[in-house]
């Protein structure tokens, strides 16, 4: 059996590796002329790390990432709303990693090349497909000419702007912007606390996020730290003024203006100083897509952001793509014919990812911040006067269970 995979990102590479474990050949087609380390920091949750560990990648992840030990949600005054251990520190069998997206992609890409050979085809822009009862053929633009490849199934792991998804749903249009713009960057700093903690602070429409993503830096005693500022500028559904990509250079002066208006008071964390100390910042709209009524047609299916693009709250984007990869490989390794296996994969993965998309639109676990802001916009003297531990816990634990990374779910 041979799978054709559109897209050489986290989802596509993880899929190729997982299929390889199950004895299924794969070929990856990436439209970029070369594989480059794009993006800044992301978090990968224990249920996804469990899958990567089973692929033998844990040691490499430990080398390039940070094992997150604690997560704090705070208001804009830096008052703690919720704090909890994460990953191994919380009793999981597998860690949670904060890691540069490009470094994660490189770990996966290097493993693909080492185990499967030169199966990543760069400079191939997917354009269309044809399928018969027995096979599928994908067509690509390569250096201005059309080339094709045949296989037993075609997997669209080509991101939020998926060409394959657009073929399935030609009237869907561009991604949906919720009116939030995100500015992101990374810089070298001394560790905060033990150098393994993550913080999300601010009110509903203005947040500051901070976490380390690597100890592998030239300056002893320092780390590479990722930061994100999110500001709501418009209402949901407003037309975007920029594309939903990873490489748009941010407007530093505009961000300064919004930070002044946001008035974060976070003690040792001064977002403006952190922004000023960052060499390059990126800016992009926060987007998702509406859940689909189906992902598949016969021998062809979608995976990752192409299937279920979601807001980056709750650390679930890349994690869910990795779970997709495992589920699809498991289904294909059974006795079902390929179309039946693909249908089983969709039946297993579409409902939970649909729910995550909806939950992330409601702020996911960050609802604890929103709840406290509604009740105490000017801060609080005692958190218990604003929200009970039980109320906050139900939000946090409800989200982790819904998204499949409750401790009992992962450790079973």
Regions found by a protein language model. Give the residues of each.
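FAD-dependent flavoprotein oxygenase/oxidase catalytic domain
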Residues: 1-412
């Amino acid at each position: 059996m041979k799978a054709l995979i559109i897209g050489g990102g986290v989802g596509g590479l993880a899929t190729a590796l997982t299929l390889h474990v199950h004895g299924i050949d794969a070929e990856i087609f990436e439209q970029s002329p070369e594989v480059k380390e794009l993006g800044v920091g992301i978090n990968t949750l224990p249920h996804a790390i469990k899958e990567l560990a089973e692929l033998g990648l844990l040691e490499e992840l430990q080398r390039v990432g940070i094992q997150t030990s604690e997560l704090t949600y705070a208001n804009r005054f830096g008052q703690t709303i919720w704090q909890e251990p994460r990953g191994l520190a919380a009793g999981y069998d597998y860690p949670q990693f904060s890691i540069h997206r490009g470094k994660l992609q490189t770990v996966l890409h290097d493993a693909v090349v080492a185990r499967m050979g030169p199966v990543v085809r760069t400079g191939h822009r997917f354009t269309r497909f044809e399928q018969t009862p027995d096979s599928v053929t994908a067509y690509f633009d390569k250096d201005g000419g059309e080339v094709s490849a045949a296989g037993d199934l075609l997997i669209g792991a080509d991101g939020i702007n998926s060409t394959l998804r657009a073929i399935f749903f030609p009237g869907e249009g561009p991604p949906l912007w919720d009116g939030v713009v995100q500015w992101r960057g990374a810089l070298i700093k001394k560790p905060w606390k033990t150098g393994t903690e993550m913080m999300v602070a601010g009110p509903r429409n203005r947040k500051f996020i901070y976490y380390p993503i690597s100890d592998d830096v030239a300056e002893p005693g320092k780390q590479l730290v990722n930061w994100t500022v999110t500001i709501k500028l418009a209402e949901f559904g407003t037309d975007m003024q920029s594309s939903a990509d990873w490489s748009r250079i941010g407007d530093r002066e505009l961000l300064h203006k919004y930070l002044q208006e946001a008035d974060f008071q976070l003690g040792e964390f001064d977002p403006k100083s952190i922004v000023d100390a960052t060499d390059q910042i990126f800016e992009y709209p926060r987007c998702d897509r509406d859940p689909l009524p189906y992902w598949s047609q016969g021998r062809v299916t979608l995976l990752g952001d192409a299937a279920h693009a979601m807001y980056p709250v709750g650390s679930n984007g890349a994690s869910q793509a990795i779970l997709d990869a495992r589920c699809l490989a498991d289904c294909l390794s059974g006795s079902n014919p390929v179309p039946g296996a693909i249908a089983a994969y969709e039946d297993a993965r579409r409902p939970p990812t649909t729910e995550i998309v909806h939950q992330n639109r409601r702020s996911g676990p960050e609802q604890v911040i929103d709840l406290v802001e509604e009740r105490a916009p000017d801060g609080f003297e005692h958190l218990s006067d604003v929200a009970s531990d039980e109320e906050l816990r139900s939000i946090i634990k409800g989200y982790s269970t819904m998204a499949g990374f409750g401790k009992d779910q992962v450790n079973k």
